[in-house]
């Protein structure tokens, strides 16, 4: 049974979900498939050299509503899951709102974040496939820690191509990588053809998640002893993240609540998708729940992108993904919320947005960090950069609810700042933070590739 103590709602470990949820099976519309270079839907055979068979099944199976969480994965999850939920009464009082604010704290994992939710099953299935190692790309310390810890659990070697442009954040990620024995390579690197090309083209102060993924993907295609892992975007990562939404659903039910608004920041969208997915069936059945994705204003894939097929990586090596995108050639500015610097949004989330189940807004650094500071001073949790964007929109919505005089329930997740990330408020409090706008020339060039398509 769930336990309610003051503002805190906790689940008994026995109540942790034993199956992940596949929302695609319940959707009243078809999510377009990834496409192979041949122009046909990608097949299991084409993915087999890169991914374990269980990951491929989760990726391509649109009919199974649930997937079993393996015993070994569940045991690893139980180190920190279920995670707690809180009623944000102090923030409600600060805002004078009639809204009821509930936030789930995704922390306590070895990575300090929700990214372990998908790193662990990907590493487990990689080991089960008989591979020696796992290779991936990402945006700094949290994913490095997540994949490093997961690989160490199952006796795998690990390599992460980490975005060079993140500078000091990446350096802290490198340090955490050493703890877990990760071989961290600054991307673009000299290890791959993709990396060499991008380094020559853009120089040392460059890099993007798309380039890091391209390097990892290239290495995986050339080394049969490793499997490729991805932190977000693909359907299997969203399925793994549904453990967050499933727990949240049970915690709200324990206090007889259901959300009127579910709000979350978005990079490629798997965590946001995992949070909202268990609440989608009620929306399909008629409940008017709003789902709001919050973008960084310099990486506005939903609010300014186009819906088309585009590669997940900068070099176009990976399958073509149906998504809202700014184009793989877009080079976003180096904002502190590095995980939000991606050129596209997960196919399921993109389809939900296209079908009007999801709304999207974009916020800048200063307004988001200012909102994060208000949350920290009210609730006592120092937030990670991307969580501040969530909180910014939560505060905006809470004030709108106040104006309406209703008592809407708002659900969101936060992750605390961890040592692998930058000190989150220094530049704001020092008065040197500035908002990053989309790099219009890069955006125009990247989106120009899609003119006349479709």
Regions found by a protein language model. Name each.
Residues 135, 142-204, 301-311, 422-431:
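Active-site-proximal loop->helix
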Residues 118, 126-165, 258-271, 386, ...:
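A short, small-residue-rich loop immediately preceding and capping a beta-strand
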